[in-house]
């Protein structure tokens, strides 16, 4: 009886702590996402914030950005196949960073071009349902600006 009670207590404790995307003995995890759920095409919309005074050339309120995220099993982006664009221009720009698969925390660097020291930083959270909420800072810390110095709130959705 004692060993059965101990076993049940251990099972309930493990299930309560389960936060991975994989189930534990049939008990589903929660809070995590998979690389497959993040990989795909994304659309982001920016809105200026008052955190930084925006300089000339900054993105406009409501401006859309698109990205192709190729996420590896450890959450890092495959830099050779991940990219972003500022429509309507067709220029494909490099993207690096990663997504914490345990909780969706996202930190991406959007470069002006390959080998450039001009970059923006996109930080926030991606959900398993295909949404993003966070902020965009131009320039990223230690980088030069891509468009014009500004800080934005960002909403995004996975489009495919």
What is the role of each PLM region?
Residues 49-51, 87, 129, 139-141:
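Short coil/turn motifs at secondary-structure junctions
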Residues 2-8:
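Sec-dependent signal peptide recognition
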Residues 18-21:
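Bacterial signal peptide processing site
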Residues 76-133:
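Contiguous, well-ordered beta-strand patches that form the walls/edges
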Residues 32-79, 112-121, 143-158:
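Short, solvent-exposed loop/hinge segments that bridge or flank secondary-structure elements
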Residues 25-31, 93-98, 131-160:
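Edge beta-strand at a domain terminus
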Residues 13-16:
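C-terminal motif of bacterial Sec signal peptides marking the signal peptidase cleavage site
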Residues 11, 24-26, 70:
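Detector for intrinsically disordered, low-structure N-terminal pre-sequences
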């Amino acid at each position: 009886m004692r060993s059965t009670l101990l076993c049940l207590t251990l099972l309930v404790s493990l299930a309560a702590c389960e936060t991975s995307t994989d189930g534990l003995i049939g008990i589903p995890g929660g809070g995590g996402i998979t690389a497959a759920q993040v990989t795909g095409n994304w659309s982001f919309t920016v809105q200026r914030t008052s955190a930084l005074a925006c300089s000339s050339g900054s993105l406009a309120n409501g401006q859309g950005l698109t990205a192709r995220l190729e996420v590896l099993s450890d959450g890092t982006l495959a830099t050779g196949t991940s990219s972003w664009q500022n429509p309507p221009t067709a220029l494909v720009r490099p993207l690096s960073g990663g997504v914490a698969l345990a909780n969706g925390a996202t930190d991406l660097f959007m470069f002006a071009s390959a080998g450039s020291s001009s970059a923006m930083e996109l930080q926030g959270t991606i959900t398993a349902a295909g949404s993003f909420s966070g902020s965009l800072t131009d320039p990223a810390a230690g980088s030069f600006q891509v468009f014009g110095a500004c800080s934005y709130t960002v909403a995004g959705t996975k489009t495919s």
